[in-house]
Each structure stands twice: as structure tokens, then as C-alpha cells.
Amino acid sequence: MLFKSVLLSTLIAVQALAENSAHQEIVTVTKTTHISNPCLENYAKKLLPNNPTGLTTGIPIVIVYAPQQPDNQVKQSESLQPTQSSKAQQQQQIQGSSVPASIHDTPTPTDHTKITVTSTTICNQKVCTVKTFSTIISHSESPTTTTTTKQNEEKSIADTKSFTHKALPSSNGAVTLKTTSVKTALTTTSTVFSATSLPSTTYTPSTSVSLVSTTKKNPVSSQSVVSTTKTISINTSLITDAVTITKEATTLPNSKHSSIFTNGSISFISTSANKVKSTVTSDISNNSQNGSSLSLTSTINQLASITNSTLTTITKPTSLVPDFSYTNSSRVSSTMRNSSEESSMVLEKSSSKLLSSTSFLNSSSIASTTESSELASATTSDSSLNHSSSSSVELSSSLSSEADSSSSSESVETGSSDETASNYSGDLFKAIDTNAPPTVFARSEIPLTIPAGVDNNGKPIGTNKFYTNLLLGNQDFMVYPLPYGLYWSKTSYYGFAVQHNNVSDRVFGSINTNNKGVASYYFNPTNNAELIFSATSFSKDSMHMKVSQMAELSALVTLSSSSNDESNYLDIPLVQGMGFVTGIYNGNLTPLLNSLFGVKDLSLETSDALLSNVLKYRATLLNNVQWLIYVTLPDKDTDFKLEVEDFYNLKGSKPVDGLIIQVAIAPEDNDNDKYYDAAAGMYVTGATVSGSVSQGTAASYKFSYTTAGKSSSNNPIVFALPHHMDSLTGSALDALTGITVTSTTKGEMTGFLTNELEFSETINQDVEFLPWTENMTGSLTYTKDQLELLASAANKELAANIAATVKNMNSNYFSGKVLDKYAQILLVVSEIIQDEEVTKDALNAMKDAFKVFTQNKQYYPLMYDTKFGGVTSTSAQDGDPNADFGSAYYNDHDFHYGYFIHAAAIVGYVDKKLGGTWAQSNKDWVNSLVRDASNPSADDTYFPVSRMFDWFSGHSWATGLFVTYKNIESSSESLHFAAAIKLWGKVVGDQSMEARGGLMISIMARSFNMYFYYKSDNTVEPKQILPNKVSGIFFENKVDYTTFFGTPADHPEYVHGIHMLPITPSSSLVRKTSYVQEEWKDQIAGFIDNVDSGWTGILRLNQALFDPKSSYEFFASNNWDDKWLDNGQSRTWSLAFAAGALNAS
């Protein structure tokens, strides 16, 4: 009876809708929706609300009921990762008078994501509108059931506007998305050509592999340092107790706040309209009852006039009462303890408002500065602190406004925002600077010839972009805007070739590996021209290519018969994520489509769902792969058609100025043609990246596609990568098509009918300079014994002439690593050991070392390249582009510069806490490195936008101007760059840069764990390579478990360690505990005992991310040997990192 009631209710609803129009009929198609018996009635009521039971319409309805199945047997009808099967031949036939039925497709197995589709079709005569709900279930989660909403009355022409709503998450990880309305209609198929016999020979793709050369220099080195004798060192005997470091203790002074007090130090800032001289005396009574009362007397004499003001009493907020813990050679340090006592501040009013606000932040000295039209500097004298009790201390200091401009006690405002980093809201892509780079970078050109026809209209040219191969050599290497691969075909057939990627075509192999029986690589065959955009006038001797409009995510290829033909040309826009490959024929070109494989069948498909000026063809190649070909005419033209000349040539019947030809691999399910139909005629011409952040943590970014042409949906079709799907938001949530296309090395891409893809991410603000792992639950704490060992290691490692050491290194990569190593030692001395005297000595040494580079006196000075627009190495000016790791030709810039920027951030941070302005004084030089590798805005015309980081791919491409496929060998050094600009932005007050670095880290956390780091449950990469645990070199079209400097057969530590170094607080944001532990267990544990070099320390510090106890024991061993350290790694930092992680876990 229950089943009968549901059936009757269904019939009632159909009749009610049918009566709205004499010609309108409703067809509801539900694909493989599994529901249990108890919910059947509720399900029907949701579909047909407000309809009484028992009413009969007489219209036959078929309801297919599937009994409840075990969870592991429930399968979905469509998949975001379909297997590669032959295309269905049956065309969709929807007619108003047909009997609707529930269609159950053959289940498709999937590893990554499943999709179930429930669709409702509204038909009027020949034209139907399909509304669809799609449920995406990531990572093989259990499916959920989705339902249609009440249908709006539709006219025969589909309403194509999108419906804005957020994703609907469920408890099992599914997200329900709604597609844009699209039209479908009766499709009539007519055969244009069908082969009755096959050619005697057919094209077979090459599966030969090109081995990676492993002759590059090892990036881990143990070059000797220039030693020196230090007169100042940490007195370990004065370390008497443990230390705990709070977040407040590492907060930088903010120039918009005027008073600073932490760790027993005071920085007092007064505000005036003019320069002033200041004298401040302070006294904290030993008899203070609550430990938080502070008396200050301040007399300020203005230059032009005198204004007296007395600060009579400040009672410090008791949540920041110093809790003194230990002494060392130069100061009494403190940490902050909580108290419930209240605070108050009493100020005597004066004619000038001298204090705007009070805050208590971390400082290591007493400083006095004045905000005015010009900033006056102040010099801090040494402070004497006598530890009397936990709540009282005597302190006196004298401050003078006379200061050396280079003194570490200078204090000046940096940054332009009134907001602190923690609550910054605004643009993520503000220009860093729009002025020319400093003149210290000599103007010159790298000795690389740009081919004729490459012209970016005076704008900087991206050197690490997907289109770079079109600028190099013979210009015939493939490019991968994704999901398709393309190349300039200059032999046999002449034009621009297109190929798709098929899982079944991947080539796996194993060579020079430590994992016997496991594939060490896979790749996709190249230069397989399934279709070639050409024209009858193109030939070997009469074809010219131009490359122009090169931007962050796009470029334009133009083919013509000669370089001076400005009237007859073929434009092919290349845009990352483009759903069609599009050719626009201009002038008197007769279109020609070639195929290396050959065409077996060509059919014309007509439908009222297509625009009247659009022709749709389906071409089946001799390899049984089907392609959709859409021809859009400027006006409806009944005379134009595609004709088959032979197996390998499809020719347009005549030239048409403005003709558009678009091709796409046909969907696995022919029913999904409707989305390509809805997008046909519109194509993407470019894309930009924009984004914003709210309150410092909630970030969003989006790809906005520019379009040309017209489609029935008023939208183009674009594709997103797997790492995009989990963070997708905005209007794209309503634009899912269910179409998937296989990428080269990044799994399945998903199609959307939209001109905008928007994503949301959360920025982690807790991770900054000091040690952090995701397992740390407590405060950063160090025992007395650990501090003594840290101090001993620091004393030994700081006995070096840092400037002399880095000056003579024959690579900016190595010198940058060494500079960063000493910066981290400085950080430990300043923040953990807290020895002020040694901190100042090390800080001055670091400043001297930086002068080598800011004055451009290193082994390979830097220059500004006026040809491509960038700050790059002069190492190739003598003819060797491979010197300095190829840096001159823009290889590894983020790796190299990340070390300098990170070191500068630490130096600036420590110096700023001491009241100095080193960061401000050197900001232009450091920012030039940031701008070169990561310029965020086209407003900065001296550098290309985002040279290294590919916002679409979710990671950087290291390879610069070398004829090969884009690749990245060290994911961790790319991460280090993002962390560096985040910290540098924090130090100089550039909140946009700081947040942008944080966003890059969040994006990499997604992409790295899908494409580079392989847990056993990874569902994006092929299962054949997962036991390797790491990608090795990740190319655009290949994953190769090796390195450029050695193979895992001999040195497995190379391929694993290059994705670890350097270990910093940001490492654990990306290298998740579960992954690191699995990699160690399955791989590293098997060879770690055989590693006896600088790689040992890298692997062991990585161990701290999941096993800090063993890591610390290694670095604290009595049998310690410095040979286990790379030049870029110190024992001091390694001990601090491992101990901090151990004690707080």
C-alpha cells in the first residue's frame, strides 16, 4: 500500500504540472538514486509536495525501487574519475510524448571522488531544460541522497542564470552542488563520413622514455666556513632555570601603539607634531605589592616650544606581569604569567597629547621614539635589572635621542596599514612596489635569443609559465594549459596540434630505484596530434607563429602563412583550465583539421538546443577516441560544412572571416554533451587571479576568465583540478557539469559552466618564527639542560666570519642557505636563550654579511634583466647558463631567494625588537627579490606577475628558460619561499604580502598532499607509484622518482630529503604528521642507518615532525659529528626545533 500511495502521489504531481501548458511536458530522470524502504514515502513527498494521495492522472510513470544494499555495494552513476572506456554510441532522444524511465548507468569504479546526479527535465515541443543536482563525494566517502527542488515553470528556451547558494556539507563529507540550467533537445545525427576500409598503416604513439640527467651539483654541501675567535659568548653557567616562551613574547612592536612592555623591558613612544628630545627615567619599587605598578617621569622639550607632561602612574595589565625565570651573561629574562589583578593608567593632561595608546609587547631594550612629520631616533642605553622577587624589580634607564642611523636601537614606523596582521582585511594582491628596482642591480640582458614573433608589447615575460616552451629553441615542445596538451606541428602536418590524456595511455617503468618491483616513473606520451588546427595555405615553407599577450595564466598563439600577413591568421588562445581548444579563423583562411591518427567516422549532430549559428560534429578517430567539434559562424550560414578529404584531413567548405572552431574530448556519458552544447561559441581568452582576506585568516581567491563569443548558457566551460574541489566556493558551486577530463599528472579535472572559479582557505597565524609542529599542544618550553646544550652549540657555530664565508661561495643558492642558517642561530640566541649581548653581536655580524649582497659584491652579483624583466644572476653572462644552478635563466629563483628573504625577516625581526630600522633601510633590496619571484600585481610593470608560483596548479614551477617540461624538484624549498615572504611581510608591515604568503602555504598544503606526498590512501596519483611515498621530480607530464643530482638506487636520501629541506615551523603545515610517519616507516627507516652525510641531519630533523624524542636524542648525542649537517642547517636550530617539539607535544 505504501508503494501504491507513492505511485499515486507521483502521478498527481505530473498531471498538475502538465496542465500548466497544453504543449509542455515534464520528464524526470533520476540516475541511480538509492533509497531505503522507510524513506521512500518521504522521498516522494519531497519530490511532490502538497499533492494528496490517491489522485490518478492516467500518465504512466515508472518508479524503479532498489532494495537497500550494503554500503560497499552502493555505487554511483557517474564518477569524477571515470575509467577509460569507449564512448557510448546511443544519442539522447527526449520527446514530449515519450515514456520517461529511471535510467541506471553501468557503475564506474572510482578511487577519488564519486558523483550522483538527480535531474529534472522540462520539455516544450522540441526543446527541453534540464535542472540537475549533483552530489560530490570526496575520497570514497559514503554517498548521500540528493533531491530536486520544486520546479519553476519554464519556457521553451532555457533560463540559464545560475542559482547562488553555498555548498551543503553532510556528515559523511559529501557536498551537494547544483548545475546551471542548460537546454537539451532531440538530437538528429547524420553521417558525413564513415570509413569502409582502414589505411594500411596507422599511427602508433611513442612510449620511449627520456631519462633524467643526474649530473647537476648536489644541493647539500659541507663547505668549510671561515672561522674566527669571538670575545663574546654565552655564559652557560648563568643559565639557572627553564624557560617558557609565549606568543605574546614574540610579538613585534607595532608603530601605531605607543608603549611596549614585556620580558622586563620597556619601549616608550611619545607622539608630537614636531621632533622632540626625550628623557625617561623609570623605577619599579621593590616594595610593590602586586608587581604591576610602574612609576615613570617624563620630561619632553620640543625644539620650537616647551610642553611639560608627567606620566604619574602606569599599572601594567596584570595578564602581562613578568615572571622572571633565569639569568645569563647579559640580562635577566622573563616570560609572562597571568594574573587576575586589574590595571589602570593615570596621565596628567597637557596641551599636547603625548600618548595615543598603550600596549605591552615583546622588547629586549628600552627605546624612546617620537612620531612626527619626521621620525626622531633614540638610542637605548643598557638596562640593569636586579631580580628581587617574582613580582618586583628595580629598573632604571636613561634614554637619549641622539642615535647612529645604523644603530640597532633605532625605531621607525614601517608599513602603511593601521591594522595589525592578526586582523588585516583587504586585498591579497596589492603591488609591493611600482618603482624601478634599486640601481645596485646593473641593467643588462641575459644572453638568450628570443625567437622572432614573440612579442609581449613591452611587458615583462613570464619565464616559468606553462607557455614558456613556445618562447624557446624551435618552439615545438608541448605546452600544457590543462586539461589539454598542445604544440606547434611543423612536420608532416602544419598547424597547432591538440591531444588529450588517457589513463590507459600512461607509460610506467622502473629504473635506478631502491624500490624493486615498484614503478619509479610514469609519463604521458607527447606530440600525439589527435587534431591539428591548420589552414589550406599553411605548409612547411609558409607558416609563421607569433606568441603574444603573455600573462599570468594565458598567452595567445597566432599562425599565419607569413610574418607580414596581418589580415589572414589563425588565433588560438591558451588559458589554464580552458574547456575547449579554440581556433578563430580571420580573413581568407580556409579551415583545415588534420589528425595523426586519422578519422574513422564523422557525423553532424543537429539540435534545437544549439545556437542557430553553431554546427556540431562528432569525430571518431581510428584509435576509437571521440572528439566533439563545434563550428560557430559569424552569422547563420547554411552553405558552410566540414568535409572529409581523406582519413587525415577535415576541410572547411570555404573561408569565413571570424569562423570559430572548438574541440573537446567527448564525455564518457553522451548525455553530458549538453554542457558542451551550452558553452559552444564562447571561449576564454585570458584569466586573472584576485583575492582578499578577512581578519587575517579567512582568505578567498578566484580565477576570473575573460571571454569572447556567445553561447546559449552565456558561460564558457572551464576545468578545475582536484585540489581546487575541496575549497571551491561562490557561484561555481552551482555550475558543476559532472564532466571529467584526465590531466597529465594531477588526476581528474572537473568541468564547470562558469567564467569564475572561487576558493576559500584558512591562513594559520600561529606559525611564525619559532619551532612549531602540528602535534604541539603546549607552550614552547626548554629545560635548563637543553638551554645549556643550545648555548654550547650556538657558541661553537657563531665562531665564524659569516660575511667572509658567504662572499666567496660560488653560488647564490649556497650563500643564501648559509646566511639563513646563521639567521636561525641568531633567532635562537635572541628568543630562546635570550642573551642580549650575544644577540647584538650576532646581529651585527649578520648585518655585515648582508652588506655583501646589498652592495652586490658576492661571487655572482645580481642584475636587472631588461629582456624578460627580472632580478637574476650574472652567472650566464660568460656563456654558461647552467652555472649557479641555472639561476641566470630564472631556474629555482624561489628556492634561492627564499633563503635570503627568510634570513632578512629574522634579522629585521630581531633588530626591530631592539629598536632598530634595518628592515626599513634594506626593504627595497629584499622586496626586489620578492617582486622578482612573486610579484602579485600587474601594476608593477618591472616584473611578470607571479613568476614562480602557479596559482592554478597550486605550486611553483622551478624550471626557467630551458627547453624542457616545467618541473619542480624541491617542494619544501618552494614552501620555504612562501613562509619567508609571510614573515618578511610581517616585519615590514606589508599585511597583504604576509597574508598572501600564508595563503600560498594553505594552497600548497592541499596540492602537495595530492600530487607530491603519497600516503597509501592517496586517490589522485596512480597506485603504481604510491609505495615510493614521494614524487621525486614532478614534471608537467611526468612523475619521476629521482633527482637531478643522483638516483635513489644509490642515494634514496636525495629524493626524499630534497622534499624536506629546510625544516622550519611551516614544514608541519604541509608535511602532515600522518604522512611523515608513513614515509619514515615505509621508506626512510630502511636506509637511514646507511646515510652518513649532511643529508643525515635533514632526515633526522624531519623526524621531529612526528617523533621529536628520537630526533632530539640524535642531535643531542655525545657522539655528535658536524658532518651530519648541510651548510644550510645548524645544530643550534636543530636542537631548538626538536626540543621545542618534544616538550610541547
From Swiss-Prot:
A Pfam family this chain is assigned to: Glyco_hydro_81
Glycosylation, residue list: 235, 263, 286, 290, 308, 328, 338, 362, 386, 423, 502, 775
Annotated region (alpha/beta subdomain), positions in chain: 668-762
Residues annotated as catalytic: 892, 969, 973
Annotated PROSITE patterns: GH81
Main enzyme class: hydrolase
The family this protein is said to belong to: Belongs to the glycosyl hydrolase 81 family.
Protein's name according to its UniProt entry: Glucan endo-1,3-beta-D-glucosidase 1
Organism: Candida albicans (strain SC5314 / ATCC MYA-2876)
